[in-house]
Design a protein with these regions (language model features):
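A structural signal for well-ordered alpha-helical segments within the folded catalytic domains
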Residues: 1, 26-27, 51, 77-85, ...
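Beta-strand elements within well-structured catalytic alpha/beta cores of enzymes
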Residues: 1-12, 31-32, 56-58, 86-87, ...
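Active-site-proximal N-terminal segment of extracellular/periplasmic enzymes that hydrolyze or transfer
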Residues: 1-37, 46, 225
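Active-site-proximal cap/lid insertion segments
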Residues: 10-23, 132-227
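Glycine-rich, phosphate-binding/catalytic loops in enzymes
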Residues: 20-25, 49, 74, 112-114, ...
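Catalytic-site neighborhoods of secreted/periplasmic enzymes
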Residues: 60-180
Length: 227
């Protein structure tokens, strides 16, 4: 059995068409909900990214895996390599693509998982969005930039930026227009990378677990035309 786990960031149940929202259009999610199984009584073990994602990664509650906040304050900071995690699926090729946010310094390779992570908003500290400032440096080389080069795309730039009024959340509250096409955006990059990993496993005739992580619709809202 192959597993593709797709995780979005900051999506409320009532914001989906399958649960009755009249404005937001989610046709593909609605189709999955109609043809698959809905877990109507599933609840996140934590209200912030780090602890919740670590619970998905390990199958443990935050009180057990030790990461209880975004960052090291009040917790262990990293997941013990002795803890259960998806990298220990026997006989599986395991991949992570996109946002990671498990621990504070660890990367997928620490747990025997292939892939690359870049946390934060967009590609923090990488210079891809040159007119934005991020505080968290990348933990991997800039694979997104390499992918853009491979595809013959220019590096997208942000224009018409509107920041929020909260001085501590100005970047998080940002809305802006991204140059280029939707095919140059990070979500397209994530899907393209995931397809490559899946094709690799199919060629090896091995089962795979691919964890695909998008930032959206978490702010900042940086989108190209026509959105």
């Amino acid at each position: 059995m192959n597993i593709i786990y797709i995780l979005l960031d900051q999506v409320r149940k009532d914001m989906l068409g399958a649960y009755g929202h009249q404005i937001v259009k989610t046709p593909n999610i609605d189709r999955l909900a109609k043809d698959g199984v809905r877990f109507n009584n599933a609840f996140t073990p934590a209200s912030v990214c780090g602890p919740a994602r670590t619970s998905l990664f390990t199958g443990l509650m935050p009180s057990t895996h030790g990461i209880i906040r975004n960052g090291e304050k009040g917790g262990t900071g990293e997941v013990s390599e002795a803890a259960p995690n998806i990298g220990k699926l026997d006989g599986y090729n395991t991949y992570v693509v996109g946002k990671w946010h498990v621990g504070t310094k660890s990367v997928p390779e620490d747990y025997g998982i292939k892939g690359h992570n870049f946390d934060g908003y967009g590609y923090p500290g990488s210079g891809v969005y040159k007119n934005l400032v991020f505080n968290q440096p990348p933990t991997h080389s800039n694979r997104y930039k390499e992918w853009l080069d491979e595809k013959g795309y220019e590096i997208p730039e942000v224009s018409r930026a509107y920041f929020g009024d909260n001085p501590h959340l100005r970047v998080q509250e940002l809305c802006g227009l991204l140059s280029g096409t939707k095919e140059q955006t990070i979500p397209y990059f994530i899907i393209d990378e995931a397809k490559s990993y899946i094709s690799e496993s199919l060629a090896e005739n091995k089962p795979f677990f691919t964890w695909i992580n998008f930032w959206g619709p978490h702010t900042p809202c940086i989108v190209p035309e026509p959105y």
